[in-house]
């Protein structure tokens, strides 16, 4: 079972985003979709629902409302959390890294 989410370092999370996520995602409002969807407003949004992005049926059918905790669960192993997702990222195994990244995303995607 994944570790419970705890607020992390937004600064470290920003660096993780730049090195692990930026090649496929944007965070700013109105930002373009890339290989992955724009993440603006991700917390509170239902999986597979970013306007204009072509999701797999698996993402659409998962029907999870993204929270800090289930983002942490997902980011530990995306293909295990949503079998059939096209997200190629293998995951962040360290809870601290997930906490830092999610703390950054919460702020950067509002």
Swiss-Prot record:
Heme found in the keyword field: yes
Signal sequence annotation: none
Post-translational modification: Binds 1 heme c group covalently per subunit.
Domain of life: Eukaryota
Keyword set, alphabetical order: Electron transport, Heme, Iron, Metal-binding, Methylation, Mitochondrion, Respiratory chain, Transport
Gene Ontology CC: mitochondrial intermembrane space
Subcellular location: Mitochondrion intermembrane space
Positions of modified residues (N6,N6,N6-trimethyllysine): 79
Binding site for heme c: 21, 24-25, 87
Gene3D superfamilies from the UniProt entry: Cytochrome c-like domain (1.10.760.10)
Keyword Acetylation: no
One Pfam entry name: Cytochrom_C
UniProt function note: Electron carrier protein. The oxidized form of the cytochrome c heme group can accept an electron from the heme group of the cytochrome c1 subunit of cytochrome reductase. Cytochrome c then transfers this electron to the cytochrome oxidase complex, the final protein carrier in the mitochondrial electron-transport chain.
Name of this chain's protein: Cytochrome c
Originating organism: Debaryomyces hansenii (strain ATCC 36239 / CBS 767 / BCRC 21394 / JCM 1990 / NBRC 0083 / IGC 2968)
Taxonomic lineage of the native organism: Eukaryota, Fungi, Dikarya, Ascomycota, Saccharomycotina
């Amino acid at each position: 079972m994944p570790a419970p989410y705890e607020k992390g370092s937004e600064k470290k999370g920003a660096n993780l985003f730049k090195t692990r996520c930026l090649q496929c995602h944007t965070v700013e409002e109105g930002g373009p979709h890339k290989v992955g969807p724009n993440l603006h407003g991700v917390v509170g949004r239902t999986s597979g629902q970013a306007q204009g992005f072509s999701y797999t049926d698996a993402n659409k059918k998962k029907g999870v409302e993204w929270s800090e905790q289930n983002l942490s669960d997902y980011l530990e192993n995306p293909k295990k959390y949503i079998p059939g997702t096209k997200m190629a990222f293998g995951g962040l195994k360290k809870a601290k890294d997930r906490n830092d990244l999610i703390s950054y995303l919460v702020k950067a995607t509002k």
